[in-house]
Swiss-Prot record:
Its main location: membrane. GO terms for cellular component: plasma membrane. HAMAP family: UPF0344. This is UPF0344 protein lin2366. The chain crosses the membrane at residues 3-23, 33-53, 62-82, 92-112. It comes from Listeria innocua serovar 6a (strain ATCC BAA-680 / CLIP 11262). It holds the Pfam family DUF1516. It is found in: Cell membrane. It comes from the Bacteria. Belongs to the UPF0344 family. Keywords: Cell membrane, Membrane, Transmembrane, Transmembrane helix. It is a multi-pass membrane protein. InterPro entries: UPF0344.
Length: 120
């Protein structure tokens, strides 16, 4: 169950982040609302990650710790990306970092879980 919560929350964070970036010029209020909803999903990701860490540590504790750090970095990069967008500063670098870190984190997550819940 926690695997599904974790996966759905991560997908929601990525979708909400991209949507917030796209709608900022049209609706600052909508942007702020999406940013707040994103933060709720951070809590879900952290809680579900804590519940699942025992399984990934069995696979490889080094990779599990690295994945935890990458997850925290993703949250930090999303916050920086959205705050830079709100301040109307260039976001290209953070967008590139966001894509790279998300791909690494998702790859590690599926490796450590053996593909669960998506490929099982």
């Amino acid at each position: 169950m926690w695997g599904y919560v974790h996966l759905i929350s991560w997908v929601a964070i990525v979708v909400l982040t991209v949507t917030a970036l796209l709608i900022y010029s049209k609706s600052v209020k909508g942007f702020t609302m999406l940013q707040m909803i994103n933060r709720v999903f951070y809590i879900l990701v952290i809680l579900s990650g804590i519940m699942m860490v025992q399984y990934s540590v069995k696979e490889s504790w080094i990779l599990a710790i690295f994945k935890i750090l990458m997850g925290i970095i993703v949250i930090g990069v999303v916050e920086m990306l959205l705050s830079y967008r709100k301040q109307q500063k260039p976001t290209g670098m953070f967008l590139m970092i966001f894509i790279i870190v998300v791909v690494i984190t998702v790859s590690l997550g599926f490796y450590l879980s053996g593909g669960y819940p998506l490929f099982n």
